[in-house]
Each structure stands twice: as structure tokens, then as C-alpha cells.
Amino acid sequence: MVKHHDVIGRYVTIEVDDCEYKVFYLQNGKGTPLICQHTAGCHNHQWRDLLEDEEIIKNYNVIAYDLPRHGKSDPPLNKEWWKEEYKLTAEHYCNFIVKLCQALDLDNPIFMGSSFGGNVALQLALRHPNKFKAVIPVEAADYAPGFYLDWWRHPHANAAQVCASGTWDLMAPQSPDKDRWLTWHYYTQGSEAFKGDLYFYSVDHDLRNELKNIDGHKCPVVMLTGTYDYLTPPEATENTARQIKGGVYIEMTDIGHFPMSENHEVFRVYLMEALKIIKERTNK
């Protein structure tokens, strides 16, 4: 059987904080830009099913990129990056996303990210509310300490196996085996970046005293978290949303920490609800 797909992949070179990045992204659909960030230590194939969801791509231009050092996006081309430890900061992370959106000429995009991508969605709503139509933080919270650990890159551990194995019990047991194993497989490939990603996730990201400064009326914030996620439990997300002016929280049953990758058919139901809320709030 031969089947050609409509999803296209391209590269764009951008400069962010004096770093030159050649960034890979996948794109499909027409309409409102919906730009998607993968989880820590992973890449854009987590969004594989969203990119081919016929109902979504009729109305949304879905773009899923690889963060530098992940997937097909290399570390900075103009730096001796191997001579220093990778530690992703909130400022650089946000600057990268804004520059990428500008380079792709995205007009008032919706940003959606999961886990450490969900946390940066909150950062964007705080720092750049006028640059986004809305944000959808998935599996996110104001603070997530305790995961910046040395053994993610310890010489006595097989980092690829350790990082991948950590995903297994974060997924709902009833999610399809094929998708659970693909989620595991993706995580065998990104162990070198995983610890540096978690510097942002557990150290530099702390919005406990800043949530009051996020205006969900100016930039709608619709937060989604799965019931099987113990890394960012539903109550942590709900507590975060409650402190944001106009913040919305939706609990996703029967799904875990990697919803778009472990079970798109369940995830899409809640995503459609989130997109409906955003449309109602931004089309007034």
C-alpha cells in the first residue's frame, strides 16, 4: 500500500539571543495558526495525529516544531555548544517561540504546549499576552519542583532507557498499546536534552507569585490535564487556573501526561472544547 500524506516538513533559520538555530517544523491545515510545543526531551511527532485530524485542519493551520537540540532541530549553529551545560531558561524559551512565530508570519496564533510546553504557555500569557490569540497549557502548573536531577545524565545509567521508562506509568493504562509504545519510543531518542529541559521545568519556571498578573480576558488561558497524570496532578492545574483572571480548567478523564501522543482520540474531544471556548471569547 502507498499513501502520501499532506503534512509537510520544512526548515527555517532564526536568530534568538545571539544563537542561530535551524528549526524544523511540520505543518498542515488552513485557518487560525495553532502552534504546538512537544514535551521535554521529545520532538514534534507527539502531535502526529493532530496534524492529520480532518476536523481540526479544516479550521486551523497546525504547526508542530522541534525545539533546538530536539528531533531535527540542531543546537545553535554559531556556538561551541558542547563546551557548556545546556540549561533552558524561561526567558530564552519564550524568546525562541516569539521569534519562530514572527519568522513564520503567524498572525495572532494560538499556542499549545504539553508538560514543560504547557508551563511555557503560562509564561507566554504573562510575558507576551498581545502576541497570542490564546494559550492552551496542557499538563501544566505554576510550579513543578524536584525533577532537575543528576541521574538523568549519569554515566552509571542508560539515559535513553531511564528517560523512556519514566513515561510508562504517566500514561493511562487503557490508552492504545500502539500509541503508548510510540510515546516510549520517542523518549529513547532525546535523553541528552532532557535534563536541560527540566532546568526550565523545575528550576526557572515559578509563577506562584505571578499568576495574578496573567489576564485571561486579554489572552485566554484554557488549561487541560489528564486524570492519570501524577507529575502534574489535576488539582495542581485547577489551582493554577483558579488564580488566573478568566482562567479555565478542563479535566481530561481516561488519559495521562502525554495526551496528544498516548491517545489522540480521547484528547481531541477536550481540545475541541478548549478551541470552542477560545473562539467564543475572541470573536466578540
Where does each model-flagged region fall?
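Alpha/beta-hydrolase fold catalytic core
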Residues: 1-35, 57-60, 106-107, 272-284
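Conserved HGGG/HGGXW glycine-rich cap/lid loop of the alpha/beta-hydrolase fold
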Residues: 21-79
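Active-site loop/oxyanion-hole signature of alpha/beta-hydrolase fold enzymes
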Residues: 18, 64-112, 269
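Short beta-strand/loop motif that positions the catalytic acidic residue
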Residues: 217, 223-225
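Conserved alpha/beta-hydrolase catalytic His-Asp/Glu region
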Residues: 146-147, 151-152, 159-216
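Flexible "cap/lid" loop of the alpha/beta hydrolase fold
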Residues: 119-163
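Catalytic active-site module of serine/aspartate enzymes centered on a nucleophile-bearing elbow/loop
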Residues: 247-284
